[in-house]
């Protein structure tokens, strides 16, 4: 039985509040300022290209994790209760993170990634359309094993992306989210690995 930690939800709510407050005063008209990651006030909302890329790439990465979680919750695939509980936990964690990153891109006057572009599938841990279709053909224990294996790779990809923005990014809000993603997903990987034992 997995227990969903309420702390990440409170943390995300706090970040959303900070983002909303920052968006009221932050002027994004000077894109040369944004590209250097500084603004006139040197405020919390300062960001650079690495922060933008992190949000643009992590949103579809999270969206695919939620798609995989929805598959596990589909009763026709007969996933185990352990898998279904973890899938629900993943959805609960990543849905608000998508909202947060989308709000950042809006505040920064930056676009979402074009999901029609083929390169989005090259992100670390992302499954191809064919791989997702193949997963959907499995049921029961076979589905559990394949799902856990896919989700471990997917989580490791997200952790790698978080590590990159921690090295290259500037926004302290992005840094905080990257730390949270690493913490959440490392914990979930440990659970997923036990499912493979």
Positions of the model-derived regions?
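Bacterial N-terminal signal peptides that target proteins for export
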Residues: 1-11
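C-terminal motif of bacterial Sec signal peptides marking the signal peptidase cleavage site
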Residues: 17-20
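All-alpha RGS (Regulator of G-protein Signaling) helical domain and cognate RGS-like helical scaffolds
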Residues: 23-197
């Amino acid at each position: 039985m997995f227990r969903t930690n309420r702390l990440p939800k409170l943390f995300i709510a706090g970040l959303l509040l900070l983002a909303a407050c920052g968006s009221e005063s932050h002027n994004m008209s000077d894109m040369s300022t944004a590209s250097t990651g500084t603004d006139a006030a040197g405020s919390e909302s300062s960001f650079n290209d690495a922060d933008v890329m992190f949000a643009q790439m992590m949103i579809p990465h999270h969206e695919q994790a939620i798609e995989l979680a929805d598959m596990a919750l589909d009763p026709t695939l007969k996933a185990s209760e352990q898998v279904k509980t973890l899938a629900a936990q993943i959805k609960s964690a990543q849905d608000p993170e998508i909202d947060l990153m989308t709000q950042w891109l809006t505040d920064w006057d930056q676009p979402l990634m074009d999901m029609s572009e083929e390169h989005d599938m090259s992100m670390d841990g992302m499954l191809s359309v064919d791989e997702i279709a193949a997963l959907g053909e499995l049921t029961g224990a076979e589905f559990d094993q394949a799902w856990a294996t896919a989700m471990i790779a997917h989580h490791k990809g997200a952790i790698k992306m978080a590590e990159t923005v921690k090295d290259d990014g500037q926004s302290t809000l992005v840094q905080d989210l990257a730390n949270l993603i690493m913490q959440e997903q490392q914990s979930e990987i440990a659970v997923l690995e036990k499912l493979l034992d």
